[in-house]
Amino acid sequence: MAHKKAGGSTRNGRDSNAQRLGVKRFGGESVLAGNIIVRQRGTKFHAGTNVGCGKDHTLFALTDGKVQFEVKGPKNRKFISIVAE
């Protein structure tokens, strides 16, 4: 009788969904109040003027205007601000 012993089971075969992080509105783009600018883990980008920071470090616009990226301070941190159009 042609039989084959059953193969063992594996503990692999899972993968998590992508988190969809990153910059959603780039420099010079127009935004409305409440628009998400960056989704991030930790503060890769810091909130500048007219930008709020959510509990998961998501940066969002507090007013309407244009997105502006800038590097400031002694530690060369990246700040995102909203400037009036």
UniProtKB/Swiss-Prot annotation:
UniProt-listed InterPro entries: Ribosomal_bL27, Ribosomal_bL27_CS
One GO location term (cellular component): cytosolic large ribosomal subunit
GO molecular-function term, one example from the UniProt record: structural constituent of ribosome
Keywords of the record: Ribonucleoprotein, Ribosomal protein
Listed GO biological process terms: translation
Protein family (similarity comment): Belongs to the bacterial ribosomal protein bL27 family.
Name of the protein in question: Large ribosomal subunit protein bL27
Organism in which the protein naturally occurs: Pectobacterium atrosepticum (strain SCRI 1043 / ATCC BAA-672) (Erwinia carotovora subsp. atroseptica)
Gene name of the encoded protein: rpmA
